[in-house]
Amino acid sequence: MTYVIHGATGAQGAPVVATLAAAGKPVTALTRDPNAAVEGARTVAAGYGSIDALIEAYRDADGVFVHLPMVSEEDRQTYARNIVAAVREARPAHVVFSTSGAPTDIGGAAAELASGLANSGVSHAVIAPTLYLENLLMPYVIDTVRERDALPYPIRTDFPVSWASHLDIADVVLALFDRHDVTGQVSVGQYPALTGPELAGAFGAHFGKDVVFEPITPEQMRASVAPVIGEGPAADVAGLYQAMSTLPHRSIAPENSAQKLLGITPRTTGQWLSDIGL
């Protein structure tokens, strides 16, 4: 009996490991580093590139949490196919996949993985956040809040978003591992959704000062994140925000939300800032 967590030392996987361990769940942390130590978990070196390694990790697991890393789309598609192949062979009891905000209704790696899980015959759920609050911790964003009392982000002023945090994802993963009756897509995020000025207002209320929203272009976003994640992934991120600019909103649908399906309400922006110690 164990729960297998991909990216266990990363931004999204680490909170899942911590949440499951705190709940007394036996955790197997998958990492690329065979010498990595993950508190509260047994560590196994296994990457998305080896189907055999994934099969070995998934076999007899009570639950598997997967999400695709921020690499090239070509690599993401390869990883998606490998995950599906391993799930079909190993037959874990339940799989939870976080799209990390990527759409699943059009082509791409996230869509391919969601479709593959749906056709695998294995119990599964797909967590669908929109945008992560952790994006706002990028130096370009949070430093501007601190130094200029402005919150820069590549969305329109009137564009509402159902923000979610990695901590919220971890809470939902824990619940879904105990609720195999909840399958299909589970949307995770604040509802009602917040516009840019409302988000800036939440930052201002937390820090005790007036913070204004500052819309920037996807190209400005690309330039700001490239030193952190690399030019290729940064270009992909900019493309996502460019495509997003044509949409009316990124609000979750309340009918398939974690609030309705699991009784879990995501943190407010202020609660999240407090929980991460800012």
Question: Model-predicted segments: where are they?
Answer:
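Active-site regions of enzymes building and remodeling cell-envelope glycoconjugates
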Residues: E39-G47
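Conserved N-proximal alpha/beta basic substrate-recognition cap immediately N-terminal to
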Residues: R81
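A hydrophobic C-terminal alpha-helical subdomain
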Residues: E219-L278
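Short, basic/glycine-rich phosphate-binding loops at helix/coil junctions
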Residues: G63-V66, I252
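Oxidoreductase cofactor-interface core, primarily capturing Rossmann-like NAD(P)-dependent enzymes
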Residues: T2-A37, G49-I55, R59-A61, L68-T78, ...
